[in-house]
């Protein structure tokens, strides 16, 4: 089911679903039919049934959706059984994910689908859950005691769905001081610290390698656009066009500068490194480049529907070469966005789209 949306030039509005009592009346039967497609992922019937009851509890109107209130709410619920299912029982996660991806592809898969990478935080009151820490929680927009997950979603003209996830475990969790907590949370010994962009890169590689979800485009926010690990994983997806936010201080050249090789001696060995000639122009930041553009370079576009009416921005783009460690790096489109008014604010996005790509492909 898709939300009502504007069809020409203005993107999605606020989601509006037309549900009838008949839609709700048949929900449990549909949920059971959905769950039955994963029967082969469980080795025993008990965890399979507890998993279904857990799903029912998550879809309920309960205010607190922890194990005990959910188990007491659903028919046939068992508190210890549901707790054991979530903490101790084993199921085939790879087969479950592959089965789910096949369902998503069948329902909404398109060759020009979009893969979306982002994170989300979950506020926690206690300190017992794995990965919980005082960290930035995007749900609240501030540092809070929380868990953070990195997620991948799939979208097409037929709908959208979450398709993968990774739990971010903060670096301090891998220190000796947290050894007891890791053991209590049964964190496997082979699990090591990974940054959020590294976790996102894992998902992109896995989804691409699996091959069940067709996608032609990939989008992500600034945290991932500023990560070489993530960008390398995206670039490895041949034929995929990406658009990722990058920091305003990202430096770039409008023309790729030439480099020369300089030799030097280090500990008796002759080595070489690439350097820029002295006359090379200083790279610009994305913000400085945006502010230097004439008004005629900007294109106004309605992007969404707000509570007070349509929301519009102005966009421009330039072909640039990024600066990394003082040297030229990857080349692509720098898509620039600014707010309307006399004192605009700017945002920058990087795309690996071909040179012939029109701006309207990046702004929709």
Predicted feature locations:
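Electropositive nucleic-acid engagement tracts
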Residues: 43-54, 58, 62-127, 206, ...
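Charged, often Cys/His-bearing segments associated with DNA-binding zinc-finger transcription factors
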Residues: 1-32
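Structural motif
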Residues: 42-50, 140-145, 340
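An anionic, glycine-rich sequence signature occurring as long contiguous blocks
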Residues: 32, 158-185, 189-193, 243-248, ...
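Short, conserved catalytic/metal-binding motifs centered on acidic residues
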Residues: 70-71, 111-125, 152, 218-224, ...
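Domain-level cores of phosphate- or acyl-group-handling catalytic modules
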Residues: 181-263
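Active-site-proximal, Lys/Arg-enriched surface segment
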Residues: 86-171, 178-182, 318
